[in-house]
Amino acid sequence: MLDVCLLGTSGMLPLPGRWLTSLMTRYNGSSLMIDCGEGTQIAVKQKGWSFNPIDVICFTHYHADHISGLPGLLLTIGNSDRKKPLTLVGPKGLGRVVSSLRVIAPELPFELKFIELTNQQEHLSICGYEIDAFRVNHAVICYGYSISIPRIGKFDVEKAKELGIPCSMWNKLQHGTAVTIDDKEYTPDMVMGAARKGLKVTYCTDSRPVQIISDNAKESDLFICEGMYGEDGKEAKAKEYKHMTFTEAAQLAKNADVREMWLTHYSPSLVRPQDYVDKARKIFPATIAANDGRTVELKFDDEG
């Protein structure tokens, strides 16, 4: 099971009742965050989730509304008795940007590890999360992220017994490690079924609608996508500032064959996003104009 919370939905600046866009997930005791603008830690507190388990923070880009909340968050995590390293992921220049922000958060009781993205597409494995970062089309270098939880196949008990593999060795095989018994090697594929469908969340803000987004969002259980503009007549402005309209996001969701899309990163001028979602739903019916704190528990297919 993967818990997903859209902490905030605002673009550019926080508003009363609308924090800056940020995502947080929880899986197997580890939390991951994408973006951390001003006030993000307040949104975490309002949700009631813990700071200490945050193991990974990914940044889409370095505009202030996506990273300016980091110093305060780091201090709060430090005050939660965290000692193990925290991994930060983002476009090239991450170390320099974070060092500048840490002028006001110089002492932390844990190490920061940096992963700087330089390629069009990169894959990372961190704390049980399979992360695919992909470069999108914004005014500055910007990445989207797909977060996947893979699921191995079922262990074939009868096959293991037939092969004479002792029960004490089963756990290793289930976790992908070969075992040797009486000079004979047994590999996981001998007793494991085909991989089962996992879980996938794709997150993209601050971009024009480009093919790489729908390619990476393909068959996501949840697609969280910016909808900067919902009103008619905003297409030219979206192109000029390299953002998206509700209908452009809906077309990406349709092309990617996702299960559900949450719109986020609304323009401050968009007071009631839900009033403009109907046109997007004509393109992709499972479109939701998300509000702050919207949460879902994504379950594997046989978990009900």
Curated annotation (Swiss-Prot):
Its cofactor is Zn(2+). It catalyses: Endonucleolytic cleavage of RNA, removing extra 3' nucleotides from tRNA precursor, generating 3' termini of tRNAs. A 3'-hydroxy group is left at the tRNA terminus and a 5'-phosphoryl group is left at the trailer molecule. Binds 2 Zn(2+) ions. The keyword Metal-binding applies. Keywords: Endonuclease, Hydrolase, Metal-binding, Nuclease, tRNA processing, Zinc. Its EC number is 3.1.26.11. Pfam families: Lactamase_B. Zn(2+) 2 binds at residues 65-66, 206, 265. InterPro entries: Metallo-B-lactamas (IPR001279), RibonucZ/Hydroxyglut_hydro (IPR036866), RNase_Z/BN (IPR013471). Zn(2+) 1 binds at residues 61, 63, 138, 206. GO terms for molecular function: 3'-tRNA processing endoribonuclease activity; zinc ion binding. The active site is at residue 65. It is an enzyme of class 3 (hydrolase). CDD domains: RNaseZ_ZiPD-like_MBL-fold. Zinc phosphodiesterase, which displays some tRNA 3'-processing endonuclease activity. Probably involved in tRNA maturation, by removing a 3'-trailer from precursor tRNA. NCBIfam families: PRK00055.1-3, RNase_Z. This is Ribonuclease Z. The lineage of its organism: Bacteria, Bacillati, Bacillota, Clostridia, Lachnospirales. The gene is rnz.
